[in-house]
């Protein structure tokens, strides 16, 4: 195992690589010194292996300049789907379907089924994880790609996600978008669109019960 920094052109060009793991690629510099794109430099080192493997992982950043967004669009674009506890319809857990009372979070956070429209608790949805599977939007692609948000995580509760959202929304209303940017990138696993493009009018920042 060899660990190399994305800003080190000499290291990137110094050895053949059969299995390449690129982590947090959205934070790579645009160029490794004067040598060019570090991701392309690293992939160039795999050309001698017919059975090479490449894994590219990242939290997304800014829409239009995100490396992982660009890479993901060229893949199978698979989303984790679980069945509705009420009707059995398979679907990804989406923020647009999260329901809560912002004035009384003790009432719990629920997810509304995209087909039957009925609401179920976090516990009910996560109990369905054992039946879950990935569904591809672009199954004919040569490379597989996967997207997960925090709603599907067994390590973080939905109430915590909502609390972070409400804090970020409060700061956004005061003119500071940084916490909301971080929330969108890290909790939803989505790219952030800069102010003036669409954010103020989306359901994202206007979630209500």
Region roles according to the model:
Residues 1-209:
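Short, flexible loop motifs at catalytic/binding sites
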């Amino acid at each position: 195992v060899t660990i190399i920094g994305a800003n080190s052109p000499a290291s990137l060009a110094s050895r053949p690589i059969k299995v390449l793991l690129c982590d947090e690629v959205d934070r790579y510099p645009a160029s490794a010194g004067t040598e060019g794109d570090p991701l392309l430099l690293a992939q160039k080192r795999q050309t001698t292996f017919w059975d090479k493997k490449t894994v590219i992982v990242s939290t997304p950043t800014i829409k239009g300049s995100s490396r992982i967004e660009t890479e993901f669009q060229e893949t199978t674009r698979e989303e984790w789907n679980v069945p509705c506890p009420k009707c059995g319809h398979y679907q990804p857990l989406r923020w647009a379907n999260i329901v809560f009372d912002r004035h009384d979070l003790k009432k719990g956070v629920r997810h509304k089924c995209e087909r039957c429209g009925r609401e179920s608790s976090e516990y009910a949805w996560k109990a369905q994880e054992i039946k879950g599977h990935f569904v591809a939007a672009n199954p004919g692609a040569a490379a597989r790609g996967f997207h997960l948000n925090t709603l599907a995580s067994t390590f973080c509760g939905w109430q915590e996600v909502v609390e972070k959202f409400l804090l970020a929304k409060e700061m956004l209303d005061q003119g500071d978008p940084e916490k909301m940017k971080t929330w969108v990138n890290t909790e939803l696993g989505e790219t952030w669109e800069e102010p003036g493009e669409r954010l103020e009018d989306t359901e994202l920042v206007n979630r209500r019960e």
